[in-house]
Design a protein with these regions (language model features):
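Surface-exposed, interaction-prone regions used to assemble/regulate multi-protein complexes
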Residues: 1-128
């Protein structure tokens, strides 16, 4: 996972000041959070770089909805902005898992799914 420079990039994308905590200072375990809060939604990312874990919480205010994802095996987090679209991408070590894409501006959008859907995951009558 990316280290400290990614905290600044996430904070800039989320337009906030990150919270950094050392859960176990003797082990050097860091946990950092960023939060994006707008009139319609609140999004929080909690990152444990050493454990390669990311928790994503998305709260919509109108109508009220909550989506929470606990992600493991995260290889890197990439923040980008192109033509006014702010995006956070969460990549995984497993190449069969699609990158999670979270668009913050102009509209909050969360896109994630499997790149390859294994036939073994479906009953025989659904397989082609």
């Amino acid at each position: 996972m990316q280290t400290l420079p990614s905290i600044a990039a996430l904070a800039e994308a989320f337009e906030c000041t990150p919270t950094i905590e050392a859960d176990h200072p003797e082990l050097g375990v860091l946990n950092y959070e960023v939060e994006f809060d707008s009139e319609d939604e609140r999004i929080r990312l909690s990152v444990l770089p050493v454990a390669e874990e990311v928790n994503v919480s998305l709260f919509t205010k109108r109508p009220p909805r909550i989506v929470r994802l606990s992600l493991e095996d995260v290889s890197k987090i990439v923040v980008s902005e192109k033509e006014g679209v702010k995006r956070v991408e969460i990549h995984f070590h497993n190449s069969e898992v699609q990158t999670l894409s979270l668009h913050l501006r102009p509209v909050v959008t969360l896109i994630w799914g499997n790149q390859q859907d294994s036939p073994e995951r479906h009953p025989p009558w659904e397989r082609d």
